A protein has these predicted regions:
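Active-site pocket scaffolds in enzymes
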Residues: 299
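Bacterial N-terminal signal peptides
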Residues: 2-17
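Beta-rich carbohydrate-recognition and catalytic domains
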Residues: 23-232, 237-293, 306-349
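Conserved glycosyltransferase catalytic-site signature
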Residues: 296
Length: 349
């Protein structure tokens, strides 16, 4: 889009190519001192303009109206992004694109995965090192299954081939008939994989399985956190700090924003780090926008320091790929009509 380049240029965000599987930009040192925000919870960000929108698919037979819920890794010299796309008809799917530089992201070819004919979305991608395979985790609704809605997975050995993913397979077989759960996230420590999800009622839940049993064999659910939170929880390991971070989306003042919690173990307990709209992980009050385009900081993913199941991030360089929309866009239509676009936050501390 002609307006995209100037928005990116004035943002001050380094939308450069990466230099390897670490996802660190070529102009950046591989390590920095950890941000003081991990101690005091005072995050400060600068945002790019929208760097990915629905692109040419706005003219498709079933026009795309939003791209959202991004997941991203840097591998083999390229960024690989999977995201939910919503069509005018209400149908949703997962779309894949890859590129060398974020400056060219919106011009990258788009590939709709078409893994299922019913509702599926909200992907997470990672390389599961014990299997030497890429995993795509997502939520799927299939009326022929019990329960009809839950976490599924597909795998491939060829990340850049969107046609190589296996058909969806359910992950959790011991769920109740009508569980309250969505936005599934996997992270592993040295012995277990952990599955986190929310239930739209202020609860964050966790299940676990032995690494040898992944992606099956999950325990019953355990309450991980109770707070004023909503959806889209993501959990990471802070590289070199021996701590874990959970960020989770919340609602306040008719907007979407992000909170943050820390723990020493994935089993918890989780303690607040930035847990209000006035003292947030990411909200309008702590984000600088040189060209205003969003008032909402919704379902995003931190740029990782690697590609595997440990979900490590560099605590000295914090970047957050998120979905954004203005107040007018967010409040003037139902959720399905919001024209979400993707932007990038970069920490200023």
């Amino acid at each position: 889009m002609p307006w995209l380049a100037p928005l990116m240029a004035v943002s001050g965000i380094a939308l450069a190519a990466g230099s390897g599987a670490s996802g660190v930009a070529a102009s950046e040192p591989a390590t920095r001192q950890p941000s003081p925000a991990w101690t005091d919870g005072r995050f400060a960000w600068k945002s790019s303009g929208p760097i990915v929108d629905v692109g040419p698919d706005r003219s498709a037979p079933d026009p795309h109206i939003a791209i959202k819920d991004p997941t991203v890794v840097f591998a083999d010299g390229r960024w690989h992004v999977f995201a939910t796309v919503r069509m005018k008809s209400g149908r949703v799917d997962i779309e894949y694109l890859n590129f060398v530089s974020w400056a060219e992201a919106n011009q990258a070819p788009r590939h709709v995965l078409a893994l299922h004919s019913q509702y599926y979305c909200a992907p997470q991608v990672f390389f599961f090192s014990p299997h030497r395979r890429w995993y795509l985790i997502y939520q799927l609704a299939d009326s022929s299954r019990q329960p009809p809605f839950g976490p599924c997975f597909s795998t491939t050995r060829r990340l850049a081939d969107p046609k190589s993913w296996t058909p969806p397979q359910p992950m959790v077989t011991n769920a109740p008939a009508k569980p309250k759960w969505l936005d599934f996230w996997v992270i592993a420590d040295t012995e277990k994989a952990h599955l986190f999800y929310t239930s739209l009622d202020g609860h964050l839940w966790r299940r676990e399985t032995r690494l040898a049993d992944f992606p099956l064999g999950w325990s019953s659910q355990q309450l991980a956190l109770r707070a004023d939170l909503f959806e889209a929880s993501h959990t990471y390991r802070l590289q070199g700090l021996n701590r874990y971070l959970t960020i989770v989306e919340a609602q306040g003042k008719a907007r979407r924003y992000y909170k943050a919690y820390l723990a020493d173990r994935l089993e918890g307990p989780w303690r607040p780090l930035a847990d209000s709209i006035e003292h947030s992980f990411a909200a309008p009050a702590n984000v600088q926008l040189d060209v205003p385009w969003t008032d909402n900081f919704s379902h995003g993913e931190l740029i990782r320091a690697g590609i595997d199941e440990r979900m490590e991030i560099n605590p000295g360089r914090i970047r957050f790929l998120y979905q954004g929309a203005s107040d007018e866009e967010y409040r003037s239509t139902g959720y399905g009509g919001i024209p979400w676009r993707l932007g990038m936050l970069e920490s200023q501390r």
